[in-house]
């Protein structure tokens, strides 16, 4: 999962993340429904690995979201990028229209926030962006939420001397054996229920 100020927002105003505690997204994000309690996650800032953990909780809430769109009447798509130095400030990736002010639209979305601070293990800078991309199941993907090849990722961490981080994560991942009140199957460590 990509976090931080360099996270591509495209047609929206961004997300509130604190990489070592929680990750935020909504129902407009590709793979939005694929994060669950018990999932192992690796979080990076598009430059380097920040850390790994296990999802402890996923909160859901309805919200109004401001979406930014291309103002070209023939386009109206959300694939816009804000430029840091060039003017006009925005460019549409779909129709190449350049503009200073995007069209805004309000949409009701489901917001999600996953908590993962209990097992957070900082591995800041241990793997660079190119190395992480090669460890994804779809190496060319540009999505913020991507599936990792976990055995390959674990091997890469172990080759850097961070094998203890993988063991810590393995110890925190629950076995899915009984139904909790939220219909998520969880076994509490040490056999308590």
Regions found by a protein language model. Give the residues of each.
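Compositionally biased, charged N-terminal/linker segments
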Residues: 1-35, 68-101, 107-119, 125-128, ...
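Short, charged beta-turn/beta-strand-edge "cap" motif at the junction between a beta-strand
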Residues: 30, 42-51
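Loop/turn positions that initiate beta-strands
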Residues: 37-41
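A generic structural signal for short, solvent-exposed coil/turn residues
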Residues: 45-47, 62, 84
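Short beta-strand-centered aromatic/proline hotspots
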Residues: 49-59
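Generic domain-boundary/flexible-linker signal
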Residues: 52, 64, 103-106
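Short, solvent-exposed secondary-structure boundary/capping segments
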Residues: 59-71
């Amino acid at each position: 999962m990509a976090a931080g100020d360099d996270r591509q927002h495209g047609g929206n105003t961004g997300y509130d993340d604190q990489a070592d505690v929680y990750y935020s997204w909504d129902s407009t994000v590709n793979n939005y429904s694929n994060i669950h309690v018990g999932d192992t996650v690796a979080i990076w800032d598009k430059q380097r690995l920040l850390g790994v953990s296990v999802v402890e909780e996923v909160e859901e809430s309805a919200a109004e979201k401001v979406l930014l769109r291309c103002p070209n009447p023939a386009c109206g798509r959300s694939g816009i990028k804000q430029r840091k130095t060039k003017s006009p400030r925005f460019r549409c990736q779909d129709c190449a229209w350049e503009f200073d002010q995007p069209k805004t639209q309000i949409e009701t979305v489901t917001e999600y926030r996953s908590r993962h601070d209990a097992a957070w293990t900082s591995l800041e800078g241990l793997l660079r962006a190119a190395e992480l991309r090669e460890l994804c199941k779809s190496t060319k993907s540009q999505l913020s939420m991507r599936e990792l090849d976990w055995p390959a990722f674990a091997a890469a961490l172990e080759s850097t001397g961070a094998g203890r981080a993988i063991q810590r994560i393995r110890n925190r991942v629950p076995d899915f054996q009984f139904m909790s009140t939220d219909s998520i199957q969880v076994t509490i460590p040490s056999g308590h229920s």
